[in-house]
C-alpha cells in the first residue's frame, strides 16, 4: 500500500537532520555536484573565442549567447525552491542534473545541425539555464532542513566552493582540451562527468522508491495545505527580506559578469599569455577563500558575535572589498597584476556564501528554497542585463574599464542596502500564514 500523499510529502521533506556520517557523505557529493554544475556552465565562456572564430560572431553576438543562459536561469529559480521545499532538494537536483548533463554533452552536435549556429547555441544555453536554475534554490532548501544552524555556513561554503572547483577544472583541463582537441571536447568532458555523477547519486545515495514518491507527489498536483503555504505577504513586508534580495541580486550579477567576460578579457588583453594561468589561478585562490569564510563565520558566531554582525562583515568582504580589486583590473597593463587582482576579486566574492546565502536561511528556514529562488531570480535577470550591457559597453567604447566599473557599482549598491536594512531574525513565523 502506498502512503498517503501528505505522509509521503512529509517523508520526502526530510524533517530529520542528517547524522554526522550522512552529512559528510552528502556534503562531499554536493560539492562535486556544484563543481560539475559550473563545469557545464563555464564551458561556453571558455570556448567563446574559438567558437566566435569558427562561426564569425562579433562581441554583441557572443554576448547574446553568453547572456542567454540567464534568460532560462531566471525562470526556474522559484520553481526549484518550491519543489525543494515540497519534495526534497536532493530529488530536484538529481533530476535536473541528468537533463543538463545530457544537453551539455550534445551541444557540439547542436552547433552543427544547420548554418543557424547563433540560434541553436542561444537555444541550448536557454535550455541549460532552465535546467540549472533549480539547483541552488533546491540546495538551499535541502541544507536548511538537514544541517544544524551552527554548521550551516561552513557546510554551505564547502558546497559553494564547488563553483570554484568547477570553474578551475574547466579552466585547467578545458584549456588543454581546447588546445589539443578543439572546443567540442570541453562539452563532451563536462557533460560526461555530470552523467557519471548522476549515476553515482542514484546508485548509492537515493533509492528508486524515493524518486517514484517524489514524482508521484508532483503528478498528483495536490494543493499544499494552508499550514505549508509560503507566507509571502509576511515575508515581503519586511525590509530585511528586500535587503537580502537586493544583496543577492548584486552578488549574483557581479559574479556572472566576471564569470562570463574574464576569459575574453585575458585572451584579448594578453594574447601571448598561457590560457591555463588566467583560467586557473583566480579559481584556485577562491577555493581556500570560500572554506575560510565559512570557518570564520561559524567561529565568530560560536564565540558569541551576533549573527547579523557576522553576515554583514562577510558581505563587506564579498561585495565591497572584492569590487575594489575589480576596479583595479581596469587600470593596469601588467599581466601579473591582472591575475592578482582577478584572483583577489573572485576569491573575496566567495565570502558571499557565508553572508547573504546563509542570511536567507536565517530569515526563513521554513521556506528558504522559495526565498532564495526569488532572490536568485532577481540576480539572474540582472545577470542577463549585466552580461549584455558589458558586451555593449565594450563594443561601443572599446574599453574594459567600463565593464569593471559596472561590476563595482552593482556590488556596492547591494552592500549598502544590506548594511542598512539587513537583519538575521526569523520573519517566517506566524500563527496564520498569509496567502493570496
Swiss-Prot record:
| Reactions listed under catalytic activity | ATP(in) = ATP(out); ADP(in) = ADP(out); GTP(in) = GTP(out)
PROSITE patterns per the record?
A: MFS, SUGAR_TRANSPORT_2
Keywords from UniProt, A to Z, are:
Cytoplasmic vesicle, Disease variant, Lysosome, Membrane, Transmembrane, Transmembrane helix, Transport
Q: Where are the transmembrane segments?
A: 64-84, 92-112, 118-138, 158-178, 181-201, 239-259, 276-296, 316-336, 369-389, 402-422
A GO-annotated cellular component:
transport vesicle membrane
Q: How does it sit in the membrane?
A: Multi-pass membrane protein
Cite the record's tissue specificity text.
Widely expressed, but more predominantly in adrenal gland, brain and thyroid.
Please state how the activity of this protein is regulated.
Activity is chloride-dependent. Inhibited by AMP-PNP, gammaS-ATP, diadenosine triphosphate, 4,4'- diisothiocyanatostilbene-2,2'-disulfonate (DIDS) and Evans blue.
GO BP terms: ADP transport; ATP export; ATP transport; guanine nucleotide transmembrane transport; lysosomal protein catabolic process; purine nucleotide import into lysosome
Family, as annotated: Belongs to the major facilitator superfamily. Sodium/anion cotransporter family.
Name the chain's protein: Voltage-gated purine nucleotide uniporter SLC17A9
Q: Which organism is it from?
A: Homo sapiens (Human)
Q: Which gene encodes it?
A: SLC17A9
Amino acid at each position: 500500500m502506498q502512503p498517503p500523499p501528505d505522509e509521503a510529502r512529509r517523508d520526502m521533506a526530510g524533517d530529520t537532520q542528517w547524522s554526522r556520517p550522512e552529512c559528510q557523505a552528502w556534503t562531499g557529493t554536493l560539492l562535486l555536484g556544484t563543481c560539475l554544475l559550473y563545469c557545464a556552465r563555464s564551458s561556453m565562456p571558455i570556448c567563446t573565442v574559438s567558437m566566435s572564430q569558427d562561426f564569425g560572431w562579433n562581441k554583441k553576438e557572443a554576448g547574446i549567447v553568453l547572456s542567454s543562459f540567464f534568460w532560462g536561469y531566471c525562470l526556474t529559480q522559484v520553481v526549484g525552491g518550491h519543489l525543494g521545499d515540497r519534495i526534497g532538494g536532493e530529488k530536484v537536483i538529481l533530476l535536473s542534473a541528468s537533463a543538463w548533463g545530457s544537453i551539455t554533452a550534445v551541444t557540439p552536435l547542436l552547433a552543427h545541425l544547420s548554418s543557424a549556429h547563433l540560434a541553436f547555441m542561444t537555444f541550448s544555453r536557454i535550455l541549460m539555464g532552465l535546467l540549472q536554475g533549480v539547483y541552488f534554490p533546491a540546495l538551499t532548501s535541502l541544507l536548511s532542513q538537514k544541517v544544524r544552524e551552527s554548521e550551516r555556513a561552513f557546510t554551505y561554503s564547502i558546497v559553494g566552493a564547488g563553483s570554484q572547483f568547477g570553474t578551475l577544472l574547466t579552466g585547467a583541463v578545458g584549456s588543454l582540451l581546447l588546445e589539443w582537441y578543439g572546443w567540442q571536447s570541453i562539452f563532451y568532458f563536462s557533460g560526461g562527468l555530470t552523467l557519471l555523477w548522476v549515476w553515482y547519486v542514484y546508485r548509492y545515495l537515493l533509492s528508486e522508491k524515493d524518486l517514484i514518491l517524489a514524482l508521484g507527489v508532483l503528478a498528483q498536483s495536490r494543493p499544499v495545505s494552508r499550514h505549508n503555504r509560503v507566507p509571502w505577504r509576511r515575508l515581503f513586508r519586511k525590509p530585511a527580506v528586500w535587503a537580502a534580495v537586493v544583496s543577492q541580486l548584486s552578488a549574483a550579477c557581479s559574479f556572472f559578469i566576471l564569470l562570463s567576460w574574464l576569459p575574453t578579457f585575458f585572451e584579448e588583453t594578453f594574447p601571448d599569455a598561457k590560457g591555463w594561468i588566467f583560467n586557473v589561478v583566480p579559481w584556485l585562490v577562491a577555493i581556500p577563500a570560500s572554506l575560510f569564510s565559512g570557518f570564520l563565520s561559524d567561529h565568530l558566531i560560536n564565540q558569541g558575535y551576533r549573527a547579523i554582525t557576522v553576515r554583514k562583515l562577510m558581505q563587506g568582504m564579498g561585495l565591497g572589498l572584492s569590487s575594489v580589486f575589480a576596479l583595479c583590473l581596469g587600470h593596469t597593463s601588467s599581466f601579473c597584476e591582472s591575475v592578482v587582482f582577478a584572483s583577489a576579486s573572485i576569491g573575496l566574492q566567495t565570502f558571499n556564501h557565508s553572508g547573504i546565502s546563509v542570511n536567507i536561511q536565517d530569515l526563513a528556514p521554513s521556506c528558504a528554497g522559495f526565498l532564495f529562488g526569488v532572490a536568485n531570480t532577481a540576480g539572474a535577470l540582472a545577470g542577463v542585463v549585466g552580461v549584455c550591457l558589458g558586451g555593449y559597453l565594450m563594443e561601443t567604447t572599446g574599453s574594459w574599464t567600463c565593464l569593471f566599473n559596472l561590476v563595482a557599482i552593482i556590488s556596492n549598491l547591494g552592500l549598502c542596502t544590506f548594511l542598512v536594512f539587513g537583519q538575521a531574525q526569523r520573519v517566517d513565523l506566524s500563527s496564520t500564514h498569509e496567502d493570496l
